[in-house]
Amino acid sequence: MKYTVNIYEVSTEKDKKLRAFAAVTFGDRFKVTGITIREGRSGNLYVSMPQYPTGEKDEQNKPIYSDVFFPKTTDFSTALRGEILEVYQERMGGKNEVDLTYGEEDFDYYVQVVNNRDLSNTTKAYARLVIGDVFVVNQISVKRSFAGNNFVAMPSQRRMVEGKAEYQDICYPVTKDFHDRLQGDIMSQFEQNREKLRSAKEKAR
C-alpha cells in the first residue's frame, strides 16, 4: 500500500509542546489530518492521533477519550509513527513530504456499519473504515438532514477560522471516484442492516 506523509510546521505560542501537524494520504484516495507531533516531559518527540470524548468517565471521574483513527497493528503503528517523526526531523533539508509503501501494493479497504436502534436520533448509523487491514478510521456516521435525506458524514473537529468556530472534516476521500465508492458502500450496508431489522421484526410478530 502506498501512502504519503506530509508535515506542517506551526506556531508554538499557544501550545508550547506542539511541534508540528502531520497528514497521511493512503493510496492517493483517503487523507487523515490533525495528527500532532509533540514534545514529552523528558524532551522526547511523540506522535498523537486526534481524539474525541467517548461520553464515559474513568475512576477519577475524568472524561475518557479515544482516537478518531489509528494504526490497527503494532507493526504498522511503529512504522507509521517512526516515519512521521523522521520526516519531521529531516524537514530542515526542505523535505516535508515523503512517499512510502507498506505491505501489498494494492489499495484495499472495507467498511463496518452499525445502525442506531434509536430511530428518533438524527445519527442513523455509525461506520468505520479499515484501510489495508492496518489502519482504522472511526467516527464516520450516517445522518439525517433537516430535509429528511440520509447522508454520510466524516469525522470533524471544531476549529477557529478567522476568529469564528467552524467544524471541519479531519479525514476525507481525496478523489470524487473514491468519495462516491465509499459513500455507496456505507449506504449500501446501512440499507442492508435496515432490511434485516425489518425482517427480524416481521418474524417476531
Language-model features: where?
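Single-stranded nucleic acid-binding surfaces, predominantly the OB-fold ssDNA-binding core
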Residues: 1-205
